[in-house]
Amino acid sequence: MTTTERPPPPPLSMSKKETPTLLDSISKKISTTETLQRLRNKNLTTLNKIKYDSELLLHYLYDDHHNKNSDYANNNINVIKISKVKVKKTGASILAHYFAQIHVSTGYSFEFHPGSQPRTFQTIHTDGLIIKVLILCDECCKKELRDYIKGENSFNVAFRNCESILCRRVSFQTVLLTCAILLLLFNVEKFSMINLLIILLILLSLFCHNNYIISNPYIEFCNHKSTNKKYDR
């Protein structure tokens, strides 16, 4: 009868040393991947919401331009175009996203998208349906931008969304969706075809409002401009 000799198992000290090293390398890879995903995916950054400083933004837009640009004093005109575009990712074309194209008197131009962190500030590239145009002096434009940043820092989808921040009104989308949700909850308790029909009509009206009911944009001047009127076009 022959016996085979098996090699002795590796010492425990070696396995204990190799295991932490392997775990460390895996954890580093996972943390790196999560960091990259957090930077690329705006939905993950909502956990760490960015708080913008309006005064810092105004400093970069306006400060030191009085001395550098000789035509600055004669170019005290700021243009803000508020537009809306269909939401493509969620809700198909039932929902609409509101944004502003801002052209500052110092020559800077950018887009402001409330609730789109970390892409709140973007270059001019979006074509949307213009709702209104604001013609403002520097001081009024600064006040408007401060209000935009304040609204962005307190953004929420229900009561402080992009429509309420830019258009200074109660969100029409929020009102209709709230009514539809309340009727749906009531319909769960006590089913009624009438409530179901009303819900469908609400969704249809929201779809028509964001796609087919197109109102003419209007131009609004601030109080410090020579023309202080609203013009429809």
From Swiss-Prot:
It is a multi-pass membrane protein. It comes from the Viruses. The keyword NADP does not apply. GO terms for cellular component: host cell membrane; host cell nucleus; membrane; virion component. Disulfide bonds: none annotated. The chain crosses the membrane at residues 171-191, 194-214. The keyword Membrane applies. Keywords: Host membrane, Host nucleus, Membrane, Transmembrane, Transmembrane helix, Virion. Its main location: host cell. It is found in: Host nucleus; Host membrane; Virion. Pfam families: Ac81. Plays an essential role in the assembly of nucleocapsids with envelopes. This is Protein AC81. It comes from Autographa californica nuclear polyhedrosis virus (AcMNPV).
